[in-house]
Amino acid sequence: MLILGHPLIPSARFIFIKNTDAVHSSANNDIVYFEAHPKNLELAKYCCENGVHFSVIFLSHKIETDAFFLFNAFKPLYCIFKDIKQAILAQQHATNYLLDSKILFSMDLNDTESWEICAKNQIDGIISKDSLLLK
């Protein structure tokens, strides 16, 4: 299981962006991320075409299967979910379709129950909710 955002485990810095201009102000080793909203498909395409490491975060509590597959066409490093049910379903899709993107669940790292749910459902990894600042 990947563990991102833990203070003792080194990982890349995640930078929230809203447009291509913000991509240019990030460092090469940063991972930019943005909301998995249809209006951001162009941003995903831009990142893919320009070799920018990016992730998408799914903020809605409803399953958005179409958005999940559309964004995965642009090969994000991570698909991040705030809703565990969505993360579990996305992990099933990622496994069945051999997607390159890793599925992450955003959680409080002190939440023992969430760790157990993620392990039981073989989620690729977790990311500290404190690592993800939405502006």
PLM feature segments, named:
Residues K75, S101-K102:
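Residue-level signal for glycine
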Residues G5, F16, F105-S106, I127:
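Structural signal for conserved beta-strand scaffold positions within catalytic alpha/beta enzyme cores
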Residues M1-L77:
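Conserved N-terminal beta1-alpha1 strand-loop-helix module at the mouth
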Residues H53, K75, T95, Q122-I123:
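Generic hydrophobic/packing signal
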Residues A36-P38, V56-I63, C79-I84, I103-T112, ...:
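Glycine-rich beta-to-alpha transition loops that act as phosphate-gripper elements at the mouths
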Residues T65-F71, I84-H93, N110-L134:
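Catalytic cores of alpha/beta
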